[in-house]
């Protein structure tokens, strides 16, 4: 029993020493090696304690109480070291995770190529939209010009018709009311044509102002 006790006590001291090494590691890879070694030793310590309990049960009654006290004290030391290792490992795991997340955040934030590409894509989309808007305005102006030319031709036709109607009316002796209706229609057409001209001028001015 004494040899088993001394061996277990020596292994406990090794675990305590390795715990200090664990706290001094600088990177996760080295720390994982130490952690695996410590957990393996703790598992061995628990097996040794079980063997010591068997030895104590076989001791003579006069020596059994003293042996039990030594083994119980050793068990308490092992439990304290086990809890300390778990606490240190948890704290270091959180530190590694925080460092990894911080590194990922910094690498995602400072990527000049991606930023430049994003800005270039945005400018390209904006340029496409401006070009599309210019084409639509050009189409509207072309349509307005075509409508204006059509109205002008219709107006000249109406003026020719109006003159002919006046001539025919005078030749046929149409009443003044009929001639007044024709004149009013011609004036309304003039107002409509002028309104279309003003609308086209406004559209052209807005287009020039918008393009800068």
From Swiss-Prot:
It holds the Pfam family V-SNARE_C. Gene3D superfamilies: 1.20.5.110. One of its GO terms (cellular component) is endoplasmic reticulum membrane. Its main location: Golgi. Disulfide bonds: none annotated. It is a single-pass type IV membrane protein. Keywords: Endoplasmic reticulum, Golgi apparatus, Membrane, Protein transport, Transmembrane, Transmembrane helix, Transport. GO terms for biological process: protein transport; vesicle fusion. The chain crosses the membrane at residues 190-210. It is found in: Golgi apparatus, cis-Golgi network membrane; Golgi apparatus membrane; Endoplasmic reticulum membrane. GO terms for molecular function: SNAP receptor activity; SNARE binding. Residues 1-189 are cytoplasmic. Belongs to the GOSR2 family. Part of a unique SNARE complex. This is Golgi SNAP receptor complex member 2 homolog memb-1.
């Amino acid at each position: 029993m004494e040899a088993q006790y001394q061996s277990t006590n020596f292994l406990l001291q090794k675990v305590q020493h390795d715990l200090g090494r664990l706290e001094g590691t600088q990177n996760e890879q080295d720390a994982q090696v130490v952690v695996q070694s410590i957990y393996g030793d703790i598992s061995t310590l628990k097996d040794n304690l079980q063997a010591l309990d068997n030895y104590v049960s076989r001791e003579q009654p006069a020596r059994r109480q003293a042996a039990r006290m030594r083994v119980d004290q050793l068990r308490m030391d092992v439990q304290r070291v086990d809890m300390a290792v778990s606490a240190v490992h948890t704290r270091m795991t959180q530190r590694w995770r925080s460092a990894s997340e911080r590194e990922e955040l910094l690498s995602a934030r400072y990527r000049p190529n991606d930023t430049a590409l994003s800005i270039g894509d945005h400018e390209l989309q904006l340029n496409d939209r401006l070009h599309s808007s210019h084409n639509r305005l050009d189409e509207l102006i072309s349509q307005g010009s075509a409508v204006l030319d059509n109205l002008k031709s219709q107006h000249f036709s109406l003026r020719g018709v109006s003159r002919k109607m006046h001539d025919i009316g005078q030749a046929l002796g149409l009443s003044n009311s009929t001639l007044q209706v024709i004149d009013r229609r011609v004036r309304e057409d003039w107002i409509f044509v002028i309104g279309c001209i003003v609308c086209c001028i406004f559209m052209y001015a807005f287009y020039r102002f918008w393009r800068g």
